[in-house]
A protein has these predicted regions:
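Charged docking surfaces used in two-component/phosphorelay signaling
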Residues: 25-33
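Short hydrophobic/Thr-rich beta-strand motif most characteristic of the beta2 strand and flanking loop
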Residues: 35-42, 50
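Active-site beta3 strand of CheY-like receiver
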Residues: 54-60
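Receiver (REC) domain active-site loop signature in two-component systems and cognate sites
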Residues: 65
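Hydrophobic/aromatic residues positioned on beta-strands within the core alpha/beta folds
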Residues: 89-91
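C-terminal output helix
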Residues: 114-125
Length: 143
C-alpha cells in the first residue's frame, strides 16, 4: 500500500469524491484557498482507491454517483482498517437521508447547494476533533 503524507503540518489532505465536475472544482478551489491539499475523484470506485492510496485527513463524499455510489464508498471506508478513522462529510443534494447517512458512519451531513464557507467550517471542526482524539490516544498529531 502506498501512502501520500501531508506536505506540511498546516496542510491537511482532503479528498473530494463527487461525480459533478463543477462541484469538485468549486469546493476544491475553495479548500485550496484555505491551504488544504485537495485531491478529487469523479466516481466511487476511484474515490475508494484514492482514499486507500492517499490516506487523507478528511473526505467529502457525494451519495449519488456512477459505478460505485456514496453509500457503498462509506460502507467500505468504515469497514477498512486503512480508512476507518478518516472523517467523512457527506455533501449531497439528497435531503431526506440524513439519519441513514449518520447511521452508515458519516461524521457530518451537508446538503447542496452548500456555501463553501460552511464546508470549510465543518472541515475545520472535524480536523480539530480528530487531532484531539489522536493526541488523547497517545498517537500525537499526524504528519
Amino acid at each position: 500500500m502506498s501512502s501520500t503524507r501531508r506536505k506540511s503540518p498546516g496542510s491537511p489532505i482532503v479528498l473530494i469524491i463527487d461525480d459533478d465536475a463543477d462541484t469538485r472544482r468549486m469546493y476544491g478551489e475553495y479548500l485550496r484557498m484555505k491551504s488544504c491539499t485537495v485531491f478529487v475523484a469523479g466516481d466511487g470506485r476511484s474515490g475508494l482507491d484514492k482514499a486507500v492510496d492517499l490516506n487523507p485527513d478528511l473526505i467529502v463524499l457525494d451519495l449519488a454517483m456512477p459505478r460505485v455510489d456514496g453509500w457503498t464508498v462509506l460502507k467500505h471506508l468504515r469497514e477498512s482498517s486503512w480508512t476507518i478513522d478518516i472523517p467523512v462529510i457527506v455533501l449531497t443534494a439528497v435531503v431526506t437521508v440524513r439519519d441513514e447517512a449518520f447511521h452508515a458512519g458519516c461524521d457530518a451531513y451537508l446538503t447542496k447547494p452548500c456555501p463553501p464557507e460552511v464546508l470549510w467550517l465543518q472541515t475545520v471542526a472535524l480536523l480539530r476533533d480528530r487531532e484531539g482524539l489522536r493526541e488523547r490516544a497517545g498517537r500525537g498529531p499526524r504528519v
